[in-house]
Regions:
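Short alpha-helical patches at coil-to-helix transitions and adjacent helical residues
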Residues: 11-14, 30-31, 112, 151
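Non-catalytic cell-wall polysaccharide-engagement segments
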Residues: 44-169
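Short, solvent-exposed loop/turn and secondary-structure capping segments
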Residues: 27-32, 73
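Alpha-helix N-cap/helix-initiation motif
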Residues: 6-7, 104
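Short, conserved phosphate-binding/catalytic loop or strand-edge motifs used
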Residues: 20, 31-38
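Short capping/connector residues at structural and topological boundaries
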Residues: 29, 38-42, 95
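Short, small-residue-biased leader/transition segments that mark boundaries at the very start
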Residues: 1-2
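Short, functionally critical alpha-helical segments immediately adjacent to catalytic or ligand/cofactor-binding
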Residues: 8-25, 58-63, 115
């Protein structure tokens, strides 16, 4: 089943998010996730509690998947995969979209399905194409990265892609 049919999410929003987050999978592994989170725990007192929770979720995920927590690579903040999920969000909101019994942060079907599910669970409305500032779609995108600038950039990128696709026909 097509992701758009299951979740009623504008596919260009998904394309925009993975483009911004990892340049479509080309840039997702600059740091070891374990080290990123541990460094925040010991070096950044304001982020220590948050990073401790995320490290716990990272360890849950790596144990479940039977992989070393020291091999998973991601961002300086501890996000990983093509969608750059933080461990707690990945554990809670990722899905096995392709049906192989694995929630894989490096499988495009699972990644796009997981982002769509995440946005839906965070208020992305059905049958809605209002991409304006502070609309329900904008708000759901903002939960993915708690920044007005991020949500605006995703929507601007989506609009630019849409314009270029339309102009090419």
């Amino acid at each position: 089943m097509c992701i758009r049919d299951r979740f009623d999410i504008d596919p260009l929003i998904l394309v925009s998010i993975v483009g911004i987050e990892t340049n479509y999978g080309k840039r997702y592994s600059e740091y070891t996730v374990f080290n990123s989170l541990y460094t925040q725990i010991v070096s950044l007192p304001k982020r220590s509690s948050w990073a401790t929770k995320e490290l716990y979720h990272l360890l849950l995920y790596t144990k479940e998947q039977n992989i070393s927590p020291f091999l998973l690579e991601g961002s300086y903040a501890g996000a990983f995969g093509y969608g750059q999920f933080i461990p707690s969000s990945f554990n809670k909101l990722s899905i096995d979209y392709n049906g192989d019994n694995k929630k894989d942060p490096y499988n495009w079907e699972d990644v796009l399905g997981s982002i769509a599910y995440y946005l839906t669970e965070n208020g992305y409305p059905e049958n809605n194409h209002n991409f304006t500032f502070r609309s329900p779609i904008w708000r759901s995108i903002r939960t993915y990265n708690r920044s007005d600038k991020y949500a605006n950039t995703v929507i601007d990128f989506r609009n630019e892609i849409s314009k270029r696709i339309f102009l090419s026909y």
